[in-house]
Amino acid sequence: MTRFRPCIDLHAGQVKQIVGGTLDSATSELRTNFVSPHPPAYFAKLYRDNDLSGAHVIMLGPGNKEAALESLKAWPGGLQVGGGITDANAREWVEAGAEKVIITSYLFPNGKFSQSHLDAVLAALDGDKSKLVIDLSCRRQGDDRWFVAMNKWQTITDMEVSEESIKALEPYCSEFLIHAADNEGLQKGIDEKLVQRLSEWCSIPVTYAGGGRNLEDLETVKRLSGGKVDLTIGSALDCFGGKGVTLQECVEWNRRQ
């Protein structure tokens, strides 16, 4: 059944909500919706106390390791961690308390999918795919086609998000995380076509993020996906300075499902 899933987005060691398509290394180009006065552990405890499992902690660029570790200490085994995950550090993050690790960019050296990199990450996790989430965050290319975007969503890769690519990757992971980068942080609604396609293509859990504004969007995702796709709401949440919906309303929505 569709659930609300929260997030902790870390940028320069702080919890922020950003406009996804503007995220490159030049801070002058970065459009930020919100910078939290609270440390990451505050949000980890908030999610833990409200039984919001499956939340993702994303390290957007360098300088976020300590902040991510702080989150994991607040809720060991309760959070997924992504951003800069490779075969060299995947196991280290699980040992530090991550429920699962999330990989994107490492799978696409020079923007091209690498099966050997995927195999290496899984091997580092002793072949335990229950510990692995593949992030197929994407940008729309033309009508109803989406391609995986990496390097903070600035580089379009050679992988189209399609039934074929989903089926090829499912044997290696326990779930997918998909940010619609063109919608991320804009609070202008979800990519309904993408949500619908994901429910048709995926046979394992999948979380969609990007443009979610309120409980109506949760209901829309539930309807479009037949309850198969979860939704992350970020910038619209009251705890991130948003006016669209409160965290408590989302918690209560989950309990009603």
UniProtKB/Swiss-Prot annotation:
<keyword id="KW-0028">Amino-acid biosynthesis</keyword>
<keyword id="KW-0413">Isomerase</keyword>
<dbReference type="InterPro" id="IPR011858">
    <property type="entry name" value="His6-like_euk"/>
</dbReference>
<dbReference type="Pfam" id="PF00977">
    <property type="entry name" value="His_biosynth"/>
</dbReference>
<dbReference type="InterPro" id="IPR044524">
    <property type="entry name" value="Isoase_HisA-like"/>
</dbReference>
<dbReference type="InterPro" id="IPR006062">
    <property type="entry name" value="His_biosynth"/>
</dbReference>
<keyword id="KW-0368">Histidine biosynthesis</keyword>
<dbReference type="GO" id="GO:0003949">
    <property type="term" value="F:1-(5-phosphoribosyl)-5-[(5-phosphoribosylamino)methylideneamino]imidazole-4-carboxamide isomerase activity"/>
</dbReference>
<dbReference type="GO" id="GO:0005737">
    <property type="term" value="C:cytoplasm"/>
</dbReference>
<keyword id="KW-0963">Cytoplasm</keyword>
<dbReference type="InterPro" id="IPR013785">
    <property type="entry name" value="Aldolase_TIM"/>
</dbReference>
<protein>
    <recommendedName>
        <fullName>1-(5-phosphoribosyl)-5-[(5-phosphoribosylamino)methylideneamino] imidazole-4-carboxamide isomerase</fullName>
        <ecNumber>5.3.1.16</ecNumber>
    </recommendedName>
</protein>
<comment type="pathway">
    <text>Amino-acid biosynthesis; L-histidine biosynthesis; L-histidine from 5-phospho-alpha-D-ribose 1-diphosphate: step 4/9.</text>
</comment>
<dbReference type="GO" id="GO:0000105">
    <property type="term" value="P:L-histidine biosynthetic process"/>
</dbReference>
<dbReference type="InterPro" id="IPR011060">
    <property type="entry name" value="RibuloseP-bd_barrel"/>
</dbReference>
<comment type="similarity">
    <text>Belongs to the HisA/HisF family.</text>
</comment>
